[in-house]
Amino acid sequence: MGRILAYSLILLALVSCGTGRKTAVTDSKEPASVQMRVGSYNLWRPGPRDDGYAWDVRKFRLAKTIAEIGFAVFGVQEFDTVIQNDLPGLVEKEGGNYEWFIFSPYNKEGGAGPKAQGIVYRKNRFTMLESHHFWLSPTPDVKSKGWDERKYTRGACCAIFKENATGLRFFLMISHMPLGKEANANAAPVILERAKEYNPESLPSFFVGDLNTREWTKSSELFRTYWNDTFLTVPADVRKGSVGTFNKRGENEDMNAAPRIDYIYYRGEGVKPLGYTCDNRRYEGYYPSDHCPIYADFIVTLPLVSTEGR
């Protein structure tokens, strides 16, 4: 009861303060607190369909959903070339002001391409300071497949961001992990190793994505030795929507019994989750994608560093 009350008081304080962000004052001994909505969304690669899930129909639902959720930063998967061409502009028309960083595991240079994933962030709020990518294989620095994942080339990307108003920095990694059980289990240590390598300052850390695994598998168990699984961490009264994240184009009718394969992990002494949501919205009976978007609200608190004399 005490833990739930603490979360409620934090949330009440945020509502009372509007944005929940303290004013950043250089050389102040008070810490700066930032509220961020972090999430993940598998967009579902377009295919030949003539129903309500056809791309030319559902792309408008997808854009509306993204804009209305109001992510601060989120990871996307199955960000195929057709989606790359259409979705950013549609989201902007709906009022979403985002920068779209793209990594295709099918591009040996790691840039844009088919079957991509990416990091989407509010371009007026954040600056991307650095980015990295790698492949989920025994040779992660070169374009490659790994273990029993024969059909798809899998990878991950990450970045360090700075919030412009406060100077607070954080690390975000995103992946679309293998379906093969052996590949999934072996990819997890690669991801964890790179998360540590690319975040040497131990900044607040987030890891999101369609991880194609369940919470009791070796991959999930390993991730929880480093990060916290937001779904499992927050009290039940601030966990909204369904347990399952994979709606399978509406075929999974009971979403609480559906697979939870999309995740939001976090790490850091100054990182506190306020709530978690799996957004199950439909439009005229159709989901925007075959996965539901997930998001979590966080308070990130770090002491400010003086910039005087720089």
Q: Positions of the model-derived regions?
A:
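N-terminal, active-site-proximal structural segment of metallo-dependent hydrolase catalytic domains
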Residues: V15-E92, P105-P114, I299-R310
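Active-site neighborhood of phospho(di)ester-bond hydrolases with catalytic His/Asp-centered motifs
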Residues: G75-Q77, F103-S104, F206-D210, D229-T233
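Metal-dependent phosphoester-hydrolase catalytic domains
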Residues: K22-D27, E182, E193-S205, T213-R310
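Structured beta-strand-rich core segments of catalytic domains in phosphoester-bond hydrolases
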Residues: Q77-R169, T277-C278
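Catalytic metal-binding/acid-base residues of hydrolase active sites
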Residues: W44, D80, H176-P178, L211-R214, ...
